[in-house]
């Protein structure tokens, strides 16, 4: 199944955090927090402004983004857990 987001929504796949600290301590799965960053898999066409024109999206497919721990709606697609959220729920794009 393939998802195509509508309006100003994006589909994001969480990127797992490191399970080992810089000092070498391994963090067990039970103590690990949900990752707060992910990769954009799909982008909607944008949000319409007051004049009816589409405002372009600030993110694109492949961008690594930061978001709140409880942002978006979780959906399962082909065994993968994905997030559907509005573009305004994203905090930043991680530059490499």
Curated annotation (Swiss-Prot):
UniProt xrefs under Pfam families: Cpn10
GO cellular component terms, A-Z: cytoplasm
CDD domains: cpn10
Keywords, sorted A to Z: Chaperone, Cytoplasm
GO biological process, one term: chaperone cofactor-dependent protein refolding
Subcellular location: Cytoplasm
Function recorded in the entry: Together with the chaperonin GroEL, plays an essential role in assisting protein folding. The GroEL-GroES system forms a nano-cage that allows encapsulation of the non-native substrate proteins and provides a physical environment optimized to promote and accelerate protein folding. GroES binds to the apical surface of the GroEL ring, thereby capping the opening of the GroEL channel.
Family: Belongs to the GroES chaperonin family.
Quaternary structure note: Heptamer of 7 subunits arranged in a ring. Interacts with the chaperonin GroEL.
The name this protein goes by in its record: Co-chaperonin GroES
Organism annotation: Polaromonas sp. (strain JS666 / ATCC BAA-500)
Organism ancestry: Bacteria, Pseudomonadati, Pseudomonadota, Betaproteobacteria, Burkholderiales
